[in-house]
Amino acid sequence: AKGRELSCVPISSGNFSAATVPYEKIINLAILSRAKSVALAHNHPSGSVLPSEKDIDVTYTLSEKLETMSLSLLDHIIIAGDEYLSICDCMARMGDFSFAD
């Protein structure tokens, strides 16, 4: 069904300041799940939901890599304590990002 979660899988872990983003693993999991889109989420142990430059770079890079496989990035969420932020929503509001259909 459209919009249904097909899989929720931890893909990486890191330390207080960074985590490796395995783009190929994300794409392979999406293909194996027969997904049309991917939502990515990660935490900020610092307690701030503000995206780092690396967070924004990951959003752009993942979106571009997914598009080459006819997949789209649904969202990239940052979670910090009881708060969350949609990077894709923020970027779309600023005119820096458009969602793939």
Give the ranges of each region predicted by the language model.
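Active-site-proximal loop/helix of nucleotide/amide-processing enzymes and allied scaffolds
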Residues: 2, 8, 12-100
